[in-house]
Amino acid sequence: MIRNVTIPSLQQTEMLLQQRRTRLFLLVPFFGTGYILSVVFHLLSWKSGTPPSTWVRLFYYDGLMLITYGALWLLLWGETHQRGPSPTRTFWSLTVASLLFLGLGYLVLRIGRPSGDLALSTPVSGFAYETGVPLTWAAVVQMNVLALLEALLAFWLLLQLRGLVLFKRTRQSERSWRWMLITMAGSALLVDLFQPGEFVLALLLSLPVGLMLRNAFRVAWILYLTFRQKLLNLGLTVLATGALSGTLAFTSGPAHEYVWHYSPALSSFVNLSLAFGVLYLVTSFLSLLFHLPTTGAFQRKVDELAALHALMQLVSQVFDVERLTETIVRLPVEAGVAQAAWLALPDFQ
């Protein structure tokens, strides 16, 4: 007996993943198993002292990374997609997350170092120069932990900024955001196949950079902030920009070697995400600064619209006899003039 097999649509899949219990049941095993297998992969490489073949790394390991961190992205997306856009909460959470990452990253890089060596700028390489195989167990631990921390920060950053970029969302803005993520992931997956100076690599990176610039100017949420809120967010953007810039310097500096040997695609995606975060914060700071003088005029416009809306409601109530009589009776009681009120109307019938 042949049965029809129905494939769920994209909307049905999103609705399924929005259910927290279902999401955890489906995605946590994928992420946990994939991450453990990646740790085992690098431990075997360290024990054998020989690098895996190109085909094994391309089809097995890169595919494993795609499934593992794809599951992590969906897990974080499910926890944050229902939150409304709040610039104050977003900038503050990014500042705290960046500082927490820097502190944990510093502690991870201290693993295996002498207790008296406090400078992380000392060029201590834990990988073979020609093969890239980890030379010590500490390098295996560092590369796996730093990769997870960087992925968590990059995914959290993008998911937090998503609410601000898609404020007053349109179909065009959603399409631009999705294409930015797709080009960032696509160029990161292909970056290991080309040399740094090749024209094709520069062309691949130009696509996400162009879309990053386009999405960085989507700051429509600024128009709906009060003067006090704009001042508060102005200070928070400075803090978040400084913390995120320090994080980008850390991921492209001391931690770059470890995450690059873990996965060049993940390292490239993280750096692109952090660069977009810094770009969006700088754009937000400049936009907030330029919108400060116009706050009063915008607030007056909002008040005028509110007064006009109230007038329209009052006019509509005048033409509604029942609502008009109800308002006349209710107002003296609400004003405290009388404890009770009534209205006698003649019956013209």
Question: Each predicted region: which residue ranges?
Answer:
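Alpha-helical transmembrane spans of integral membrane proteins, capturing the lipid-embedded, hydrophobic core
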Residues: F31, Y35, D62, L66, ...
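Hydrophobic transmembrane alpha-helical segments in integral membrane proteins
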Residues: L26-L27, P52-L66
